Amino acid sequence: MKKLLTTLFALLMTTAGTQAQVSFGHAEKINKGWSFLRVDSAWNVSERPAMKEKAFDDTRWRKVDLPHDWGVELPMSPDKGSCQGYLPGGVAWYRLHIPVGKLTEGRRHYIYFEGVYNYSEVYLNGHLLGKRPSGFASFLYDMTPYLEKDDNVVAVRVNHAQEFDSRWYTGSGIYRNVWLVSAPEVHLAQWGTAYRLTAINKSKATVEVDVETSGEGRVKSEELKIKNEKLSATVELIDKDGKVVATAKTTIGSSEKKTVKLTVKNPQRWTLERPYLYMLRTVLNAAKAEDNDTSVVRAGLRTLDFSPNKGFALNGEWMKVKGVCVHDDAGVLGVAVPKEVWRRRLAELKDIGVNAIRLSHNPHAPELYDLCDEMGLLVMDEASDEWEFPKRKWMKGWNAGKPEFQGTYTYFEEWIDRDVADMVRRDRCHPCVFLWSIGNEVDYPNDPYSHPVLNGDGTGFTQPAYGGYKPEQPNAERIGIIAQRLAKIVKDIDPSRPTTGALAGVVMSNATAYPSAVDVVGYNYTESRYGIDHKTYPERIIYGSENRHDLPAWKAVTDNEHIFGQFLWTGIDYLGESGQWPARGSSAGLLDLAGWRKPLGWYRAALLSTKPVCYIGTYRNVSRPGRNGNNRRNQRPNINAPGRWNWEKGDSVNVVCITNGKDARLLLNGKEVGGKPGHDESTGALMWSVAYEPGTLRCETDNGAAYELTTTGKPYALKVTTDSVAHVFVEVVDEGGNTVTTADNEVTLMVRGARLLGMEHGNIADATITGRQQRNRLRTHGGRLVAYIQPEEGTTMFTVRASSPFLEGGTLTINR
């Protein structure tokens, strides 16, 4: 019996994960077999109004599967904006033919898009279903009024002609999943199920569950009215063994919201170490069983407490939030990122010691929230980066040259209320979400808002003033007014979590209603205000919403009980916000674009991890002119030093040790060298200067950690490995099997039984990596690369063969 219940629970978990954010009816992905055409005058491909019509001939269009980001299929160009990673946008159409067999007579049919960038227009058989300018919003359209008895055609126009509308790479296209949903005439509302933990102890928990139905305006016949009178809803909470641990029932109308109460005995809490997930199943019971509707969502029971003096507590335990910010992309994949790629990235961040993710600066793909629920990571969900005025979008490098001012501000007033509400309704069932952010750096001084306080008060402050108060600029008081409006929208939907905002101009915002409009106030790069503002505003809850990687920024958290945490900029390198050409993105992450840990990631692990940590990197010790013309050696350790032990014999080499131990010793070919290491107070790193000899360099710390570097020979062969069906790793190795970290050999991949989505090496400065013609060929960086693989449907095995001139190739066969 227990096995049967466990199987049932696994099925429910799969259903919840598969259907993602579709919380009613029967949902089916329709990602396969779309026709795609990018319309571009430069390519002599013109747009025609008939492209939305059912009868339009799209047989010559390219076939693509979703999710799809056309931006990374095209070459980078210095003529494009550095803000978007020198990648193009444009206008494109997608079309999908839905056979009549996929539709069920007598039911309503919907189409649900998790995300389309941007300015989407969706048509069914030539009829406009709706428009959504936001490229980050998820949205649902009712197809029923325009369905025909034969095949039906969905056409989607995507307009990213304003290519410079974001400060980072957004991608272009239908870059998230699309779902076809079938439901009875009266059904549970999309995102209509929500729960709140109202009380919990070891023996009992009380959970309130909202149930909402949709059917208003459709219940017209007497038969349907009779059905409506007999509607009821049953709510069940199911544990991991498949056992129903709490249940409640209520009558409900065809377009009504009801709240029921569940009592759970011996509740299991959702924690970061043990993220226990129940299943919350809601059944809308109609007069006939075939008219029933079901919603299944995951549920985690946890408490959140915030204090201006003690910080933040999860489940009553006060803790520090060790967060990072992340953007949507994954390098060569653009923003069409498979779930397993995110799983690997999040697992690496968690291994470093990260316990929270700030989803910058927009709602992300639903699968990412599912992973954070499963893996035990807190999430700060963020609505937008821009309000009623545009920010600077840099064209020739970060903060360089003349900016553009395209942006999402063009539809702010019309859509922001809906976009914020939809974010909260969509994501409120995720236990990982602990903060709702209404905006990022909307208060940057004179970009565009200004205030007399920018003239200074004689005491000085750290925020850039850009020439002081500019009365011709928009009045900063507007920020507080908008913040009050957006915070109210959030709290009306979900009073169980606090609102926040990430403030860039704290001093200026303190002169407005913005900080008081939100429950928790985020400070971007303003550690110097932590103590001052804690005294000035003793009821304010403060944390670092965006921070540098340096040790003083982290000590500002650990040394101040009232500061509950920080979010590093960033957790992972990302496309866009690039430096000068040919940089395709920002290298501010703990992980590179390929998802590999950088030395900076090891440095953060030494600060955050509870496990023993040791890493060594090396660089040549060169003389540099000091003050008064004297020469001096490199005294401050470079914490970004690469892990390599290939130098010239006799070179003086600096060896940097990053560790959470207090002391370490260095061994070269088994003999201790370097003596007692120097300790750098500014970074906490240890360092030796030693004479280079080939062989094995090993560091051992006093807390039991160790790290080795080995001198490698010439490139000899390719080593091909995998950690899952999503990733295949290719390394250039010498005859001893050691990775040659200096190798940049070109690798060609041949894949059978699967689709090669792309190859990534993590090199932020490589402008040749984009473009479809480059998809199966790439030079290694640091002697390695990762290939992203998507198995074909129905296949149980696929093969990857790697080759490179003058090297022995490698072949890997993977069984699913």
Language-model regions, residue ranges each:
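Short, hydrophobic beta-strand segments
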Residues: 143, 260-269, 686-692, 774-793
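Active-site-adjacent substrate/metal-binding segments within catalytic domains
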Residues: 67-100, 104-125, 130-133, 140, ...
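Extended acidic/polar, glycine-enriched regions
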Residues: 148-149, 210-220, 225-308, 691-694, ...
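Substrate-binding clefts and catalytic carboxylate motifs of secreted carbohydrate-active enzymes
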Residues: 26-46, 55-56, 65-66, 163, ...
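Bacterial Sec-dependent N-terminal signal peptides
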Residues: 1-23
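Short flexible loop/turn segments that cap and initiate beta-strands
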Residues: 56, 227-234, 273-278, 652, ...
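Accessory beta-strand-rich segments of carbohydrate-active enzymes
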Residues: 28, 35-39, 84, 89-191, ...
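Beta-strand-rich binding/interaction modules
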Residues: 124, 204-217, 227-251, 258-260, ...
